């Protein structure tokens, strides 16, 4: 039993504080010993890579190529344009670095398979829908791409190419999905997409979702 009660209590408090400080310092020393320092050169040497998920989103655009049974292209709403040369066993992206992910249509010229037109902006009307930035064209089977106008179209569900002249192209434009738009309608280019002229416009609330060229008469469109 302590004769000096106040002194005993203070000694206990001091001992407790000392013990806490000792444990804290011991933890800091061990943490410093176990921590590993990395040079900035280590991080500068690393490269970004895609580790998944390996999913490009839903697809509303796909096409084969006449005379080439194993060659196909598809456009996704969140992953750009993809190509397979082995009937779908493997796929490679051919649009990364050129344009955005949302694709509404893909068309390959029957006359020259190296010529590809892509209409950006998906056509699946839903709560979360991605718009695009017009028409893109490749003349080397997807190695490189160039923008070909119609940037305000937002959604291009269909592109059709003349069967014997890849410079004659038709584009069906849906336009803005949620408001009236003067950009809707059917457009035609006769110079490979350099310029476009509007050939059909019903009204600012009626967009185009599909186009068909008559296989027996390329002057007839539906």
Residue ranges and their predicted role:
Residues 1-34:
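Bacterial Sec-dependent N-terminal signal peptides
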């Amino acid at each position: 039993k302590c004769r000096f009660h106040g002194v005993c209590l203070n000694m206990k408090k001091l001992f407790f504080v000392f013990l806490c400080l000792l444990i804290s310092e011991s933890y800091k020393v061990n943490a410093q010993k176990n921590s590993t320092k990395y040079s900035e050169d280590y991080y500068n040497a690393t490269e970004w890579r895609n580790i998944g998920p390996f999913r490009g989103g839903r697809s509303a655009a796909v096409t084969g190529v006449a005379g080439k049974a194993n060659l196909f292209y598809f456009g996704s709403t969140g992953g750009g344009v993809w190509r397979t040369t082995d009937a779908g066993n493997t796929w490679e992206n051919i649009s990364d670095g050129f344009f955005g992910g949302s694709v509404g249509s893909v068309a390959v010229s029957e006359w020259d398979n190296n010529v590809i037109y892509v209409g950006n902006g998906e056509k699946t009307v839903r709560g979360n829908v991605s718009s695009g930035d017009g028409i893109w064209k490749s003349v080397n089977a997807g190695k490189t791409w160039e923008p070909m106008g119609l940037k305000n179209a937002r959604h291009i569900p269909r592109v059709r190419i003349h069967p014997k002249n890849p410079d004659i192209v038709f584009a069906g434009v849906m336009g803005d999905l949620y408001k009236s738009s003067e950009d809707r309608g059917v457009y035609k280019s006769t110079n490979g997409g350099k310029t476009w002229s509007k050939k059909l416009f019903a009204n600012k609330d009626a967009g185009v979702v599909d186009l068909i060229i008559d296989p027996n008469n390329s002057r007839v469109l539906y």
